[in-house]
């Protein structure tokens, strides 16, 4: 649940005649891309409202200037309500960065339904709920929304069907939202990174092992070898992955741009997936099937 004691008001508005301090809400701000973005915006003079899971280490986030931390479970309706109440109570809101994400790999046959549901709730539904609730504030300031998607939203990879589905759905939502708010002064951007050196890569591998170990033996037998090979490729990708600071700089640039591009590919893997997505479906299927071996 969002912590009410952390839902305090930010610093008072600046005196009349001075430039107002811009305010950004960043979800998943305790680590990785979220923390790097919070740091980049704070260093540029923004106020930051950063969310973190209850119990997460938020020391680095709290140490940033002009930053408020809210403990939030984005899958819990009451927790979301407390978050929204806290944000709406702020004097202004200039940006919403929907960054919080979850990846739990596994075959469709063996992935528990609750793990599929949770990825959709965090990666797709929560960003839509925040956008719906906070659009009035963003209209008032001519602000922007940045959604952190993934290259896998363009091409679904073996054992990443749930994650890819959640990011493909997020991309569809952002495309529709962008068209719906055109002319309102609110910008809507989707970032599609490939591999990034954050905890989501290592955490997803650990979760994938749990999924594999929890499958019935007759099901696991079909998938163990290719899943382990997938985890090995993920470890290799981690070594050459983009730094979270690269994504943070892009987000900061987007928020300083009046009319940013609708979509932003970043990283070698994301660009490769974007090219694969352009191929005829039969070619694309053969390439993806090779990754399931």
Residue ranges and their predicted role:
Residues 30-31:
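Conserved glycine-rich cofactor-binding loop
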Residues 131, 166-169:
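Active-site helix of classical SDR
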Residues 99-104:
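Conserved NAD(P)H cofactor-binding loop of Rossmann-fold oxidoreductase domains
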Residues 183-235:
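C-terminal beta-strand-loop-alpha-helix "lid" module of Rossmann-like NAD(P)-dependent dehydrogenases
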Residues 107-108, 115-117:
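Substrate-binding pocket helix/loop in short-chain dehydrogenase/reductase
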Residues 64-78:
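Rossmann-fold cofactor-recognition segment
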Residues 131-132, 175:
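A short, exposed helix-loop element centered on a Lys and neighboring polar residues
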């Amino acid at each position: 649940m969002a912590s009410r004691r952390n839902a305090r008001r930010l610093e008072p508005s600046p005196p009349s005649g001075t430039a107002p301090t811009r305010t950004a809400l960043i979800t998943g701000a305790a680590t990785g891309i979220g923390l790097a973005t919070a740091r980049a915006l704070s260093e540029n003079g923004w106020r930051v409202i950063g969310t973190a899971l209850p119990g997460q280490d938020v020391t680095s986030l709290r140490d940033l200037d002009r930053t408020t931390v809210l403990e939030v479970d984005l899958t819990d309706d009451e927790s979301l309500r407390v978050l929204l109440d806290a944000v709406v109570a702020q004097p202004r809101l200039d940006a919403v960065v929907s960054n919080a994400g979850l990846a739990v790999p596994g075959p469709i046959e063996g992935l528990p339904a609750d793990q599929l549901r949770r990825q959709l709730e965090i990666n797709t539904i929560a960003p839509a709920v925040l956008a719906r609730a906070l659009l009035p504030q963003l209209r008032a300031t001519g602000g922007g929304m940045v959604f952190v998607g993934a290259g896998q939203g363009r091409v679904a990879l073996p054992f990443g069907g749930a994650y890819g589905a959640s990011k493909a759905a997020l991309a569809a939502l952002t495309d529709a939202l962008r068209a719906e708010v055109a002319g309102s002064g609110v910008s809507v951007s989707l970032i599609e990174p490939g591999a990034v050196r954050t905890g989501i890569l290592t955490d997803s591998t650990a979760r994938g092992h749990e999924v594999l170990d929890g499958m019935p033996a007759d099901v696991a037998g079909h998938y163990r070898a290719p899943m382990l090979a997938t985890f090995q490729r993920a470890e290799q990708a981690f070594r050459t992955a983009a730094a979270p600071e690269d994504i943070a700089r892009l987000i900061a640039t987007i928020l300083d741009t009046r009319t940013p591009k609708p979509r932003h590919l970043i990283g070698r893997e994301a660009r490769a997936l974007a090219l694969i997505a352009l191929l005829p479906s039969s070619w694309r299927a053969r390439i993806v099937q090779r990754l399931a071996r």
